[in-house]
UniProtKB/Swiss-Prot annotation:
GO terms, molecular function: NAD binding; oxidoreductase activity, acting on the CH-OH group of donors, NAD or NADP as acceptor
Record InterPro entries: D-2-hydroxyacid_DH, D-isomer_2_OHA_DH_cat_dom, D-isomer_DH_NAD-bd, NAD(P)-bd_dom_sf
Protein name as it appears in the record: Putative 2-hydroxyacid dehydrogenase SAOUHSC_02577
Binding site for NAD(+): 155-156, 234-236, 260, 283-286
Catalytic residues as annotated in Swiss-Prot or TrEMBL: 236, 265, 283 (proton donor)
Protein species of origin: Staphylococcus aureus (strain NCTC 8325 / PS 47)
EC number: 1.1.1.-
Top enzyme class: oxidoreductase
Family as reported in the entry's similarity comment: Belongs to the D-isomer specific 2-hydroxyacid dehydrogenase family.
Transmembrane segments: none
Keywords, in A-Z order: NAD, Oxidoreductase
Length: 317
């Protein structure tokens, strides 16, 4: 029986599928698997189930001399050297569609949380309390009827747009390619990035990360935004220059931000933690029972297909 190495605990539904076809070795330590353990684990393995937090570099790929597939448990795959994997004839797959609804739900949740100051209100209610309802007390911003600007109208961005339309929001989007069919379906308008930044009340980042996207949102971009704008990032941390965001929040160049991802993840800078006008969540975009179970099935089936000589779903290289 061929061996699969699983770089961290995954839901039981996928693990059971793997156990029917492989000898399964899984990292069960606390925290992230370290490089030495990962290199040892992939030796003699024909499949690797990696997590978004698993750094699969050339050293790891070279150690996995028998690898046929690296099935990444997540929609992103910037944790893997996919070009080198291609050179070694190793398929790399991801789990794109499984994350769509969960991440779109969270994106809209972050919009509401930061605009209506829900987290601040919860903290106040649990600590000092409040003196009762008052006309000027704890005002936030309404979402309905505002303009949302979506950076990246892929599967997740489109799902965010549909949810935004339910709030009667106008939808702007930007990306490398115009998507006219999606425009008609959703009622979205394609604009360039600068136009989006200048006109949107809520700016959501739902694009995949690649080196060209690094610090897409920096000091210059924050200066373009409305002083009442909010930035929401549920994609990848390095798309936003985090220190520039901190400065924009401190200088009231924008009204607030909500982040599920961070530039130096898992570290969150103390400056961000100290600000009241930012909502922080611990990279939980697709952290639902439904999405994580589906992702578990997808990576298991991809590994099974690869060792059976079939082309797996969702190959990214």
């Amino acid at each position: 029986m061929e061996k699969v190495y699983v770089a961290g605990a995954i839901p039981e539904v996928g693990l059971k599928l793997l156990q029917e076809h492989f000898e399964v070795e899984m990292y069960e330590g606390k925290g992230l698997v370290d490089k030495d353990t990962l290199i040892k684990g992939v030796k003699n393995a024909t499949a690797l189930i990696s997590l978004l937090s698993t750094n699969v570099d050339k050293d790891v790929i070279d150690a996995g001399k028998d690898l046929k597939i690296i099935a990444n448990y997540g929609a992103g795959f910037n944790n893997i050297d996919i070009e080198y994997a291609r050179e070694k004839s190793i398929d790399v797959t991801n789990t794109p569609k499984a994350s769509t609804n969960a991440t779109a739900d969270l994106t809209i949740g972050l919009v509401l949380a930061v605009a209506r100051r829900i987290v601040e209100g919860d903290q106040l209610s649990r600590t000092t309390g409040f003196d009762g309802w008052a006309p000027l007390f704890f005002r936030g911003r309404e979402v309905s009827g505002k303009t949302i600007g979506i950076i990246g109208l892929g599967e997740i961005g489109s799902a965010v747009a549909r949810r935004a339309r339910a709030f009667d929001m106008d939808v702007l989007y930007t990306g490398p390619n115009r998507k006219e069919e999606k425009e008609r379906e959703i009622g979205a308008k394609y604009v360039d990035l600068d136009t989006l930044l200048k006109n949107a009340d809520f700016i959501t980042i739902n694009a995949a990360y690649n080196p060209k996207m690094h610090h897409l949102i920096d000091t210059e971009q924050f200066k373009m935004m409305k002083s009442t704008a909010y930035l929401i990032n549920a994609s990848r941390g390095p798309i936003v220059h985090e220190q520039a965001l901190v400065q924009a929040l401190k200088d009231n160049e924008i009204e607030g931000a909500a982040l599920d991802v961070y530039e130096f993840e898992p570290d969150i800078t103390d400056d961000l933690k100290s600000l009241n006008n930012v909502v922080l969540t611990p990279h939980i975009g697709n952290a639902t029972f439904e999405a994580r179970d589906m992702m578990s099935k997808i990576v298991a089936n991809a590994a099974i297909s690869a060792v059976q000589g079939e082309k797996p779903q969702f190959v990214v290289n």
